[in-house]
Curated annotation (Swiss-Prot):
Source species of the chain: Corynebacterium diphtheriae (strain ATCC 700971 / NCTC 13129 / Biotype gravis)
Enzyme class: hydrolase
Subunit structure: Monomer.
Site (Stabilizes the basic form of H active site to accept a proton): 98
Record's subcellular location: Cytoplasm
Underlying gene: pth
A single MF term (Gene Ontology): tRNA binding
Gene Ontology CC annotations of this record: cytoplasm
Lineage of origin: Bacteria, Bacillati, Actinomycetota, Actinomycetes, Mycobacteriales
Residues annotated as catalytic: 22
Protein name: Peptidyl-tRNA hydrolase
Length: 184
C-alpha cells in the first residue's frame, strides 16, 4: 500500500505572525485546503502531535495537510510524530517554507538537499534523521539594506506583495498538486 503524502506548511502561531513573511508556508496550506476533497478540508487539532491537521485528498491521492503549532525553529519533532503516526514514507513529506534566497513570488521545489540556514528545515531534518524529503521554497526576497534576516521574516508583506500573495500561494499549491499526482 502506498503511503499518503504529508504536506506541512511552516509558520508561527499567533495573531502577531499571521501576515508575516515567515508564515507564507501556512498561507500556502490555506490555499491548498481549498482544493481538497471534500472541499474545503478543515484543520483540527491532532493532540498527539500538537499540530493542526486535515486528512483529505488531492485528486485521488490521500494527503495529510498540517500546520505545526510549535514555533518554526522547533517544528521537527511535530513533523516526525505526524509522519510516524500516519505511517508516511520520509520521501513523501513535502515542507512549504519561506525562502530568503528566492525573489518574492518565486517557487522552488527540490528533493533532499541542505537547509540553507533555515532553522525550521534544520529542525525537521534533525528530527527525521534524513534529508530525504521534499522542500518547497516560497520566495520572500532578501531584507533591504542592513536589516537582519530575523527581523525581515517577522515583518508583514508590503501592500504590493500582499496583493500578489493569492497568486504566489496558488502557484505553490499547483506545485504540490503536481507532486502528489505524479511520482518524482
Amino acid at each position: 500500500m502506498t503511503s499518503p503524502y504529508l504536506i506541512v506548511g511552516l509558520g508561527n502561531l499567533g495573531p502577531e505572525y499571521t501576515k508575516t513573511r515567515h508564515n507564507i508556508g501556512y498561507m500556502a496550506i490555506d490555499e491548498l485546503l481549498t482544493r481538497t476533497s471534500p472541499m474545503p478540508a478543515t484543520l483540527t487539532v491532532h493532540k498527539k502531535t500538537n499540530t493542526l491537521v486535515a486528512e483529505t485528498r488531492l485528486g485521488t491521492q490521500k494527503v495529510i495537510v498540517a500546520k505545526p503549532r510549535a514555533f518554526m525553529n522547533v517544528t521537527g519533532p511535530s513533523v516526525r510524530k505526524l509522519a510516524d503516526f500516519f505511517t508516511v514514507d520520509r520521501n513523501r513529506i513535502v515542507v512549504l517554507y519561506d525562502d530568503l534566497d528566492l525573489e518574492f513570488g518565486a517557487i522552488k521545489f527540490r528533493h533532499g538537499g541542505g537547509d540553507h540556514g533555515h532553522n525550521g528545515l534544520k529542525s525537521i531534518t534533525q528530527a527525521l534523521g534524513t534529508k530525504d524529503y521534499i522542500r518547497g521554497g516560497i520566495g520572500i526576497g532578501r531584507p533591504p539594506g542592513r536589516m537582519a534576516p530575523k527581523s525581515f521574516v517577522l515583518k508583514p508583506f508590503s501592500k504590493i506583495e500582499q496583493s500578489e500573495l493569492p497568486i504566489v500561494c496558488a502557484d505553490a499549491a499547483d506545485e504540490v498538486e503536481k507532486i502528489t499526482t505524479s511520482e518524482l
